[in-house]
């Protein structure tokens, strides 16, 4: 089992990234909440990981902090929730926000996540309520905090990367493009910031 990786961030193509550890490149998929906190390509990064073994592939998922990984593990234990849906939920909501939704049994934010209807949201909240009794919301203490502004990319490539990332989370291409287009003053924003703002807009509607 691979529990943690520390190395050089070699590639970043939302929601995928490659970390070079002593010459070996590990490909991971991460929730957008982790992606926002990644340093620039070429810098050192540490992520907590979860390995999913399938007949046709070994899939590695990365998280900024242990709480995120534990949440992911709780989610994929639920009936009908695979890694893709778990990442979509975690990309739209921070850990504390999702915990608060569970505590309040509030489906309003969950139903805006692709693949989650009202009945599914209600079932997830009921199943998670007992599991989350031991969880307490607290300010997130991430290991991947960047003190500076997010890196700036060219407008066309940043928007294309953002649309691609949203589609990978389950949004339709038209929905993703519309969400990006609705962002005001987006010139010069990185793909990470475009993803963050578009998800916030779609989840909060």
From Swiss-Prot:
Please classify the protein's predominant subcellular localization into one broad category.
cytoplasm
Task: Report residue spans for region: Domain II.
Answer: 65-143
GO CC terms of this entry = cytoplasm; Holliday junction helicase complex; Holliday junction resolvase complex
Q: Where is this region: Domain III?
A: 154-205
Biological process GO annotation list?
DNA recombination; DNA repair
Locations listed in the record: Cytoplasm
- A GO molecular-function term, please? four-way junction helicase activity
> Which InterPro entries does the protein's record reference?
DNA_helicase_Holl-junc_RuvA_I, Hlx-hairpin-Hlx_DNA-bd_motif, NA-bd_OB-fold, RuvA, RuvA_2-like, RuvA_C, RuvA_C_sf
Cite the residue spans of the region called Domain I. Answer: 1-64
The keyword Transcription is assigned to this record: no
Region listing for Flexible linker, in residue ranges: 144-154
Q: Which UniProt keywords apply?
A: Cytoplasm, DNA damage, DNA recombination, DNA repair, DNA-binding
* Family assignment from sequence similarity: Belongs to the RuvA family.
Q: Which HAMAP family match?
A: DNA_HJ_migration_RuvA
Q: What does this protein do?
A: The RuvA-RuvB-RuvC complex processes Holliday junction (HJ) DNA during genetic recombination and DNA repair, while the RuvA-RuvB complex plays an important role in the rescue of blocked DNA replication forks via replication fork reversal (RFR). RuvA specifically binds to HJ cruciform DNA, conferring on it an open structure. The RuvB hexamer acts as an ATP-dependent pump, pulling dsDNA into and through the RuvAB complex. HJ branch migration allows RuvC to scan DNA until it finds its consensus sequence, where it cleaves and resolves the cruciform DNA.
Description of its domains: Has three domains with a flexible linker between the domains II and III and assumes an 'L' shape. Domain III is highly mobile and contacts RuvB.
Recorded protein name is Holliday junction branch migration complex subunit RuvA
Upper lineage is:
Bacteria, Pseudomonadati, Pseudomonadota, Gammaproteobacteria, Pseudomonadales
User: What gene name is given for the protein in this entry?
Assistant: ruvA
